[in-house]
């Protein structure tokens, strides 16, 4: 087998006919500017060809079930292995997917509980064990031989009646004593029982002192008792009947209530199977309900003015119901909802119960008619309409008022009562899945089961332990197995898939990864790199697209693509060892690695104003422990901490949702907190995340940034367009008129090929240009609308520099490092980092008041050192205009340039959720228990760290005292 992967003539996207050789079975890092062509080489060329060749080796029948990748634009590749791609895409949007299910650990847990689990009665907590007569006798012989005992057989349990027939049958069978409701009687002296009261009747089978010489007699007595008691028997002291009885069962059931289970199966522990799922929530762990907080959208308004949408004066039918209610209960329909008595509000929302109310209805003829009936209530009315409607539009409209809450039946565990009451080492399956992975691993390391259970469990526990260990190795020890897959970040999802691949133990495979270090603290980086080298050492080729300095330094082979982005990239600037990259004059990466270029620390940090602070008190969502957060206004603040320490919960789920609801009038669910103060300092809050800017190929940077509207207006003002009477709508590819109707403005026609990949061919009418011939005849400075959409931002800026409405938006795209993007590039082809920067550009192009609160979550994703430098300039520009910028970030180059750093920790999950230190980067670097500070100290001048910053240490402490809780 060849020792090299030979690539000849790679021209995918912006690659410029690359010829290169990559060593197999090594760790290869591909780096370079954002948009330089790294992903085009790694994913769209190497991975695509490896995957395509493997799939094409399968039968035509098998191929129709697999998505076959498009053949990359390359002359020749040899030395490829079957390829596995691990990208930064959210794992699943299925609400049933959890960390446990996607790693398959949950499958092993189900098997473990089915094979060695100990079921217990949910009511009485007795183990459900079937015992033999010998086991029962042996147990009785261990009791106190000085005590007198009686053996009882339950005949009637908690049933109403006089039960005269039961006593007659017992008498006929020769029994002389019975116990009725806990009292002993001779069978002929039993009092008449109360007919309407529940009774328990037990036959006394034998009375004895436990001694070895009565073993045979006891065995016969037990057989009689079990036959009479339908498999149940109990032993009770004769002298003190208040003592706890010893219960026995020959069936797999509870000796008290006869609760039983069939044989345990793995399906019983699956929340995706009817056998195991909670019947109330169908295994989802949450139930949907119409939320009064969403139904009453304006509690400050009156019912007549629109407190509840659709039940005000504008809707005659529903308003006449409210008017009749007001008359019956004597409340004012013009009074605000908040001022109405609680019982009145409850009646309006949930109905009048059994109380009949006189309602006045308007007839079609304009008259009035009266009817007396109960009031249904607004919430039950919505529930009924949601249930009965067949209209998707009505259902979608009503869904706006629906919220979810933890299922009251299963408490969010998703499993039914039987599955929730099976134990291994005194822990149920739901109790295990809520443990952080680190703690779960510790549980299995110390798990000791005796006898046959231990023999069966040993192999299953080994598999579970290995898989949990892999998750710990990739820095995910803070996650829980019940965590929903759709709540994971892209980086977490990618590392979970990476852990699964290590678990698979494949050899001779080519792995292609996209920035696995995203969302990972520097402390966990070493473990991740250890994981990658372990994959390599198994005999695999590991190709990583990465910007992290540690990863680049640890690579066996480095490939630097550039020199610029987009059309200015696609070339190999340098390749080889770390030393070769650092020495290469054309390598921008080498310049940063060697220290010839660096991101500078600001000469002067902006001090916080203790009188202008945003104070958030008592934040306790997820793992936060009553955190008190203080954000200085008008500064660039970094939120740091190890993965899972609570950064996203504190900023995204608490601060942003709270500020957006208060300032922007949004209605996001807010994580729990005590109080907030200082929101009046801001007039707008903007969250810039990495979600896509559009989910269809029709979305693009021009439409998202709002540039397409002035563009279309400009083309409509061209003399030829005015002469033809064309409006701006003529130049939209989304509506009829100017677009090509053959492809409906897509420019491509989809041809389904069944077992081959779907083929998208250029429309043969417009030849991929989206517009009809008449529209394309309109030109501005020699370019038609399609030519403009095909331009890069950089070229378009030269063309439109005299048009302020367009130029301003183009300039901000250049500022955030997206000069290489095409204006009409499909939003679905943008990476998460590119999408985030398009959003940032849109915000920058708006006129800001200098009182905006910007929140960014890991904006350096996908960014090279050079791109980070440009991004920091943009964020400092926002800060200098008076805005407040909050960034959740692990990148040390960003953290060291911040004005203020708030470090959470000390660890992830349950061992995190506290603010360790708040202050300048120098203050954080000097903190002895801060993981961030430990790594940050290496980048700051030693004198600064020891002095805790450029200011007087006393002044620093005073500010920190004011700011920090």
From Swiss-Prot:
Q: Which GO terms of the cellular component aspect does the record hold? A: cytoplasm; excinuclease repair complex
Q: Which CDD domains match?
A: ABC_UvrA_I, ABC_UvrA_II
The protein's GO terms of the molecular function aspect are: ATP binding; ATP hydrolysis activity; DNA binding; excinuclease ABC activity; zinc ion binding
Where is the protein found, in the record's own terms? Answer: Cytoplasm
InterPro entries attached here?
Answer: ABC_transporter-like_ATP-bd (IPR003439), ABC_transporter-like_CS (IPR017871), ATP_grasp_subdomain_1 (IPR013815), P-loop_NTPase (IPR027417), UvrA (IPR004602), UvrA_DNA-bd (IPR041552), UvrA_inter (IPR041102)
Question: Could you say which residues bind ATP here?
Answer: 32-39, 641-648
The principal location of this protein is: cytoplasm
GO terms (BP aspect): nucleotide-excision repair; SOS response
Give the UniProt keywords, A-Z. Answer: ATP-binding, Cytoplasm, DNA damage, DNA excision, DNA repair, DNA-binding, Excision nuclease, Metal-binding, Nucleotide-binding, Repeat, SOS response, Zinc, Zinc-finger
Q: Where are the zinc fingers (C4-type)?
A: 254-281, 740-766
Give all residue intervals belonging to the ABC transporter domain. 311-588, 608-937
Oligomer and partners: Forms a heterotetramer with UvrB during the search for lesions.
Q: State the similarity comment.
A: Belongs to the ABC transporter superfamily. UvrA family.
Task performed by this protein:
The UvrABC repair system catalyzes the recognition and processing of DNA lesions. UvrA is an ATPase and a DNA-binding protein. A damage recognition complex composed of 2 UvrA and 2 UvrB subunits scans DNA for abnormalities. When the presence of a lesion has been verified by UvrB, the UvrA molecules dissociate.
| UniProt cross-references to PANTHER family, sorted A to Z | UVRABC SYSTEM PROTEIN A
Protein name as annotated = UvrABC system protein A
Gene for this chain: uvrA
């Amino acid at each position: 087998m060849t020792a090299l992967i030979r690539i000849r003539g790679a021209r995918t996207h912006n690659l410029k006919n690359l010829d290169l050789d990559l060593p197999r079975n090594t760790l290869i890092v591909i780096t370079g500017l954002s948009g330089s062509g790294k992903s085009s080489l790694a994913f769209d060329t190497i991975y695509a060809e490896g995957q395509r060749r493997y799939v094409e080796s399968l039968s035509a029948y098998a191929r129709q079930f697999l998505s076959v990748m498009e053949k990359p634009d390359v002359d020749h590749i040899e030395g490829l292995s079957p390829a596995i791609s691990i990208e930064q895409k959210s794992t699943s949007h299925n609400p049933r997917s959890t960390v446990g299910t996607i790693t398959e650990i949950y499958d092993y847990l189900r098997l473990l509980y089915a094979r060695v689990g100990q079921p217990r009665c949910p009511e009485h907590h007795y183990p459900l064990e079937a015992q033999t007569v010998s086991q029962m006798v042996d147990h009785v012989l261990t009791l106190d031989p000085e005590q007198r005992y009686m053996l009882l057989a339950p005949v009637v349990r908690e049933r109403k009646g006089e039960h005269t027939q039961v006593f007659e049958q017992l008498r006929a069978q020769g029994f002389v004593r019975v116990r009725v409701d806990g009292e002993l009687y001779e069978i002929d002296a039993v009092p008449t029982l109360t007919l309407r009261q529940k009774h328990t009747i037990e036959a006394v089978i034998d009375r004895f002192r436990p001694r070895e010489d009565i073993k045979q007699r006891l065995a016969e007595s037990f057989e009689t008792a079990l036959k009479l008691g339908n498999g149940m028997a109990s032993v009770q002291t004769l002298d003190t009947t208040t003592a706890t009885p010893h219960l026995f069962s020959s069936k797999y059931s509870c000796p008290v209530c006869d609760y039983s289970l069939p044989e345990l199966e793995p399906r019983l522990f699956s929340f995706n199977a009817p056998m195991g799922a909670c019947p109330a929530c169908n295994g989802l762990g949450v139930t949907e309900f119409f939320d009064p907080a969403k139904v009453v959208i304006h509690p400050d308004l009156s019912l007549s003015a629109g407190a509840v949408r659709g039940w005000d004066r504008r809707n005659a039918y529903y308003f006449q119901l409210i008017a009749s209610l007001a008359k019956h209960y004597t409340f004012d329909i013009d009074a605000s909802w908040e001022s109405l008595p609680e019982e009145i509000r409850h009646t309006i929302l949930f109905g009048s119960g059994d109380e009949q109310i006189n309602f006045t209805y308007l007839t079609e003829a304009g008259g009035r008619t009266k009817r007396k009936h109960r009031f249904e209530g607004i919430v039950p009315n919505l529930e009924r309409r949601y249930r009965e409607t067949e209209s998707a539009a009505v259902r979608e409209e009503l869904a706006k008022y629906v919220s979810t809450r933890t299922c009251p039946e299963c408490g969010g565990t998703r499993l039914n009562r039987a599955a929730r009451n099976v134990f291994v080492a005194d822990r149920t399956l739901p109790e295990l899945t809520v443990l952080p992975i680190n703690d779960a691993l510790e549980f299995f390391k110390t798990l000791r089961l005796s006898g046959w259970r231990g023999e069966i469990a040993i192999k299953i526990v080994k598999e579970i332990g290995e898989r949990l260990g892999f998750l710990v190795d990739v820095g995910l020890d803070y996650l829980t197995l019940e965590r929903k897959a759709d709540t994971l970040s892209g980086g977490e999802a990618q590392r979970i898939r990476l852990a699964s691949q290590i678990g698979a133990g494949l050899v001779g495979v080519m792995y292609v990864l996209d920035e696995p270090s995203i969302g990972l603290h520097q402390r966990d980086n070493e473990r991740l790199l250890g994981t990658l080298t372990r994959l390599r050492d198994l005999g695999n080729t590991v190709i990583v697209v990465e910007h992290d300095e540690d990863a680049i330094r640890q690579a066996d082979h480095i490939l630097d693509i550039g020199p610029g982005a987009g059309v200015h990239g696609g070339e190999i600037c340098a390749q080889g060892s770390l030393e070769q990259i650092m020495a290469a004059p054309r390598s921008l990466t080498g310049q940063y690695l060697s220290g010839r270029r660096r991101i500078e620390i600001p000469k002067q940090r902006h001090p916080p104003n203790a009188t202008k602070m945003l104070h958030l008190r008592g934040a306790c969502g997820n793992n936060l422990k009553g955190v008190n957060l203080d954000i200085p206004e008008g500064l660039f603040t970094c939120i740091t901490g190890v993965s899972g320490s609570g950064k996203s919960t504190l900023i995204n789920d608490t601060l942003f949702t709270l500020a957006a609801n208060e300032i922007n009038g949004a209605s996001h669910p807010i994580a729990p907190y005590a109080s907030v103060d200082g929101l009046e300092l801001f007039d707008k809050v903007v969250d810039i995340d990495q979600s896509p800017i559009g989910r269809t190929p029709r979305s693009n940077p021009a439409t998202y940034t709002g540039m397409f509207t002035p563009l279309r207006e400009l083309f409509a003002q061209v003399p030829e367009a005015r002469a033809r009477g064309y409006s701006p709508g003529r130049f939209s590819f989304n509506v009829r008129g100017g677009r090509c109707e053959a492809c409906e403005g897509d420019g491509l026609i989809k041809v389904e090929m069944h077992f081959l990949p779907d083929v998208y061919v250029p429309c043969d009418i417009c030849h991929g240009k989206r517009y009809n011939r008449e529209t394309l005849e309109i030109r501005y400075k020699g370019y038609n609308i399609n030519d403009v959409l095909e331009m890069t931002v950089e070229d378009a800026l030269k063309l439109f520099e005299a048009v302020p409405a367009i130029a301003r938006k183009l300039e901000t795209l250049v500022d955030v490092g997206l000069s290489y993007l095409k204006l009409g590039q499909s939003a679905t082809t943008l990476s998460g980092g590119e999408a985030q920067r398009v959003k940032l550009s849109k915000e920058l192009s708006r006129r800001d008041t200098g009182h905006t609160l910007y929140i960014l979550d890991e904006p350096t994703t996908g960014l090279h050192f050079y791109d980070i430098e440009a991004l920091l300039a943009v964020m400092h520009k926002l800060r200098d205009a008076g805005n407040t910028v909050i960034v959740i970030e692990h990148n040390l180059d960003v953290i060291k340039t911040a004005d203020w750093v708030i470090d959470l920790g000390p660890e992830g999950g349950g061992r995190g959720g506290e603010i360790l230190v708040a202050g300048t980067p120098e203050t954080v670097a000097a903190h002895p228990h801060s993981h961030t500070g430990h790594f940050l100290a290496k980048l700051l001048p030693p004198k600064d760290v020891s002095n805790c910053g450029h200011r007087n240490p006393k002044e620093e402490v005073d500010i920190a005292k004011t700011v920090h809780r």
